[in-house]
Swiss-Prot record:
Native species: Xylella fastidiosa (strain 9a5c)
GO CC annotations on file: cytosol
PANTHER family named among the record's database cross-references: UNCHARACTERIZED PROTEIN YQGE (PTHR30327), UPF0301 PROTEIN YQGE (PTHR30327:SF1)
Name of the protein: UPF0301 protein XF_2228
Highest taxon in the source lineage: Bacteria
Family per similarity comment: Belongs to the UPF0301 (AlgH) family.
Length: 188
């Protein structure tokens, strides 16, 4: 009899103070895909050096929305840093999109950005350049090594919480105060 496969999709990874990788120190990542081949996610609390207005301009997409032009683009991770990823919350699906869970989608389609620029896109969306990737078994090992806490994804944390507050707030959802933890780990 085989063991059921656990999926980490639609989970938030919260880097513990002991996280050795500087790409993820004090990071929060949404796991978008997880299977026997590995995992893929997007870091949710690292601003890139770009605004959405700059990205749209480079893509030849115009928008009249000042709010959209000023939106910070996230540095989603060290993998494919020149590729755009859009996480959105909607009943409508734009282009080829991956359902993460509870009406939350991930896409690399230009369609959603065009719709956002025209005012007909999702009302809540995060745009990131790059993503995070883990080889088969790598993320599970990092969890065993106490590099991450894990909590179910929450749309309000993604879309309604300021970038600089996401790390603490995500951990707070399970009663953890990250500033009271040591950066030393061990196993009992």
């Amino acid at each position: 009899m085989s063991m059921p496969t656990m999926t980490l999709v639609n989970q938030l990874l919260i880097a513990l103070p002991s996280m050795p990788d500087p790409h993820f120190a004090r990071g929060v990542a949404l796991i978008c895909q997880h299977d026997s081949n590995g995992s893929m996610g997007v870091v949710l609390n690292r601003p890139s050096e770009y605004t959405l207005g700059e990205v749209l301009f480079q893509m030849g997409i115009e928008t009249a929305s000042e709010t959209l032009r000023e939106q910070v683009v996230l540095a989603g991770g060290p993998v494919h840093p020149d590729r755009g990823f859009v996480i959105y919350d909607s009943e409508h699906v734009w282009g080829p999109s991956l359902l993460i869970g509870d009406g939350l989608y991930l896409t690399t389609s230009r369609d959603v950005l065009t719709a956002m620029a025209e005012g007909s896109g999702p009302s809540r969306a995060l745009v990131a350049l790059g993503c995070a990737g883990w080889a088969a078994g790598q993320l599970e090992l990092e969890l065993v090594e106490n590099n991450w806490l894990m909590v179910p994804a929450d749309a309000s944390l993604l879309f309604d919480t300021a970038l600089e507050q996401r790390w603490q707030r995500a951990a707070g959802r399970i009663g953890v105060d990250l500033f009271r933890l040591t950066d030393y780990t061990g196993h009992a």
